[in-house]
Amino acid sequence: MQQTSFEDQSNHTAWGLGLEADSVLEPTRDKGLQRLQAFMPNAGRAYQTHRNSDFGAGKHTHVSMLSPYLRHRMIDEAEVLETVLQHHSPNDAFKFIQEVFWRSYWKGWLEHRSLLWPEYQRQLPICLQQVQEGKHSNNSYQRAVAGQTDIPLFNDWCAELEQTGYLHNHARMWFASIWIFTLRLPWELGADYFVRHLIDGDPASNTLGWRWVAGLHTAGKTYLATPKNIRTCAELRLGASTDQQLGLNRLATSTFNLPERLSEQARQKTPIAWPTPAPGVPSCAPGKRGRRALLLTEEDLTWRPAQTPAGCVALSPSPRSVLAPSSTLVGEFVDAALSDALQRQQHGWNDTVPTVAPKALDETALIDWLVEQGMDEVICAYQPIGPARLRIEGLREPLAAKGISLQLQMRDYDRLVWPHASKGFFQLGKRIPEFLDVMSLAHGA
């Protein structure tokens, strides 16, 4: 079995984030753009040098703190790449640019295996029941999620996660490794705990990041958290505390092969049915008035169609987990982000101002609003694999029953990058210069 540790991982991070969250972040697009501009001077060589350092809660100064905005596309990948290349050459900003594409890789990889995430969700209750039925395993699980293990540093990460909605990238990897190989808990439950508490929690990067640490994404290649690599990246956070005081002396010294609980079918590639590029002028069925509404979800809060819609409405936040609600921090951030997106629809259109729903609505209220507004068609950004996608697809039939069609449109960036994410990151990563060229971003500062 091949084990990796920090020394082997200086060139990438398992979650493909590197652009991280913090509780001080305000869930508006304006604040995301301000943070993007503020971090740009540090997105070149300085980022490459210092991005691996975890200084502790409130001290994550060497990362951009953009991931919540990217997660919900309050800002999008293309404008982040364009901005960084206005300040740095592609070579100087390579590590920052690569992190953006790591996140895109995870999203695209899961798109090619559309059965994996739904099966993982179906297995979660079974996995939890099995843990709860074992006295030792249940005690270990309950202590882990309560931050009451005999590893004080692990407990500190739990506290930071629950209090801020954030963990540094390497802390996420160390946490996952300890959860799996030291506490011997199922990766599935660890991934679920993360996605409920991380403000930037994402079905693709979170689920697949945990599988990567467990040695299931790249078969047999596990990630081992060791006292040495933790101290290498978190020296200032740990201070003069000894390994014994931190519980680092209790860490597993080797990994082991985990059983693959997802079926072979779930792990196989599935046919892709991405929307065809949208026509320049919207079409409308005979007899219809052509009243089109833009539908927003938490997956993409900035996408707009070429033509001004007659109205705009947002779908209420989707539950991230089948086991428990998301944390209060996550819920408040997503609610406020949706409200900000609706408010922004009052501005920025070339001609008329659309009628905007006062708040995000559940399925029943959303359909009622569309009917009241006399809408014939709903247009929405393509939804990647995850809970929002299931809900949007579930709207097709009840919308059709009211004479309202549903059209999805895909971003050019996703259409460019995702087809190359079906295998390992290397196959996508080597095309980054090509992607930048296609996007007319190859010749930055």
Language-model features: locations:
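Active-site-proximal binding-pocket segments
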Residues: 75-78, 83, 91-279, 404
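Trp/Phe/Arg-rich N-terminal binding region typifying the photolyase-homology
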Residues: 1-98, 102-108, 112-126, 159-163, ...
